[in-house]
Amino acid sequence: MAKKSMIAKAQRKPKFQVRAYTRCRICGRPHSVYRDFGLCRVCLRKMASEGLIPGLRKASW
């Protein structure tokens, strides 16, 4: 889990627009966040395998 202070800091509007960054809505992780879902790769994989994201499933070929 991310520190509460870092999550609060990310929610504030930055002084310069290029400083804004995305965080996972579930765990607050700052890296590898999918913008379409607002989730990091770890949470996305977990929720997809549990069937909590409609239309998303694990690929197999």
Curated annotation (Swiss-Prot):
Known partners and oligomeric status: Part of the 30S ribosomal subunit. Contacts proteins S3 and S10.
GO molecular function terms listed in the Swiss-Prot or TrEMBL record: rRNA binding; structural constituent of ribosome; zinc ion binding
The protein's name in its UniProt record: Small ribosomal subunit protein uS14
Keywords (A to Z) from UniProt: Metal-binding, Ribonucleoprotein, Ribosomal protein, RNA-binding, rRNA-binding, Zinc
Annotated Zn(2+) binding sites: C24, C27, C40, C43
Purpose: Binds 16S rRNA, required for the assembly of 30S particles and may also be responsible for determining the conformation of the 16S rRNA at the A site.
CC terms in the record's Gene Ontology section: cytoplasm; small ribosomal subunit
Signal sequence coordinates: none
One GO-annotated biological process of the protein: translation
